[in-house]
Amino acid sequence: MNALSPVTAPKARSFRLEPRQPAASHEEERLHRKQRLAATFRLFGRYGFDQGLAGHVTARDPEFPEQYWINPLGVHFSQIRTSDLQLVDHDGNILIGNRPINNAGFTIHSALHKARPDEIAAAHTQFT
């Protein structure tokens, strides 16, 4: 039985996403993306999409599109906060933050962000 079987999966609830007004500045949009990214990690952690160190989710920086925010290595998804996120460039340099990142995650996401400059975020995770 997997984590999403009808026996163990949480009951689905529907919700409606309201349109969002464009951000007034790069800083406002950056905060919005980082908050949503941290919330995504916590949701993934809550529902079991957090096996080991294999998962990573990234969001492109709005001001510097060749850079993106990624989770630090060794922090459980359910514990990630906005302040934990690391800003990296396509070469793997950590520009903001002082924690290591998952090298496999960097390799996957840097290729995705280079190949798809129109995409804002990407996720890769594993579960049992």
Please report, for each region that a protein language model flagged, where it lies by residue:
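Histidine-centered divalent metal-coordination motifs
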Residues: 124-128
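An anion-binding catalytic pocket shared by soluble metabolic enzymes
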Residues: 27, 34-121
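Extreme N-terminal flexible tails
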Residues: 1-24, 33
